[in-house]
Regions:
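Generic structural detector for well-ordered beta-strands
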Residues: 37-43, 95, 140-142
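A generic structural signal for short beta-strands and their flanking turns/coil linkers
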Residues: 34-38, 88-92, 104-108, 118-120, ...
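Hydrophobic beta-strand-centered segment that forms part of the acyl-chain substrate-binding groove
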Residues: 73-107
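Hydrophobic (often cysteine-bearing) scaffold residues that line and stabilize catalytic clefts
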Residues: 65
Length: 168
C-alpha cells in the first residue's frame, strides 16, 4: 500500500471524515479538469420502468442517467488507482433536463472538479448527438484499500450481517 489513503477512523463503515485534506502524500494523482466519457445508446432497458408499476415513459430514465454518471466517474478513477486500491461510490446527484428516446445516442462526460484526500468529485453531463444537454450532476467516489472494501462489503461481511458467518 502506498500510504495515499486515509485510515478508516470510524471502524464501522466506509465514511471518511469531513474536513481539510489529509497530510501530504494522500491526495489522488488525478488532475482537476481530467475527463472520461461513456457512449450510450438508449435501449428499452434504459427507459422508465418500475417493478410494481410497469412501464411509465419510453424515454431515458433518470436512474439510468445516474448509473451512467457513476460509471463515467469510475472510468476516470480506474486510470489512477494503484495496485491494492479500489473505489466505491459515496454520492450521486442528477438533474434531468430533457428527454431522449430509444435509439438515441447519449454521451456522458465526467470531469474531475475536486480531489480531497481519497475523495474524487466529478461534474457529469449527458448530451445528445446534437449537443443538447440532457442532464447534469455530480458524483463522489472514495478510494480505499481493497482489503478494507472486501471486509466491509464482501461475502464475509454479508454473512456477518445476516448472522450466518461460519466463524461465529
Amino acid at each position: 500500500m502506498t500510504g495515499r489513503l486515509l485510515p478508516d477512523p470510524s471502524g464501522g463503515d466506509l465514511r471518511v471524515p469531513a474536513g481539510p485534506p489529509p497530510e501530504e502524500g494522500t491526495v489522488l494523482p488525478i488532475p482537476v479538469g481530467a475527463t472520461a466519457t461513456l457512449d450510450v445508446v438508449v435501449t428499452p432497458e434504459l427507459t422508465v420502468h418500475f417493478d410494481e408499476l410497469g412501464p411509465v415513459h419510453p424515454v431515458y430514465a433518470t436512474y439510468s442517467m445516474a448509473k451512467h454518471f457513476e460509471e463515467a466517474g469510475r472510468k476516470l478513477l480506474l486510470r489512477h488507482l494503484e495496485p491494492g486500491e479500489g473505489g466505491i461510490g459515496r454520492s450521486v446527484a442528477v438533474e434531468h433536463l430533457g428527454p431522449s428516446w430509444v435509439g438515441d445516442a447519449v454521451t456522458v462526460t465526467a470531469r474531475c472538479t475536486e480531489v480531497s484526500g481519497n475523495r474524487l468529485t466529478c461534474a457529469c453531463t449527458a448530451t445528445d448527438a446534437d449537443g443538447r444537454e440532457l442532464g447534469r450532476g455530480t458524483t463522489v467516489q472514495v478510494v480505499l484499500p481493497d482489503e478494507l472494501l472486501e471486509s466491509r462489503i464482501g461475502p464475509a461481511a454479508q454473512a456477518r450481517r445476516r448472522g450466518t458467518d461460519p466463524r461465529g
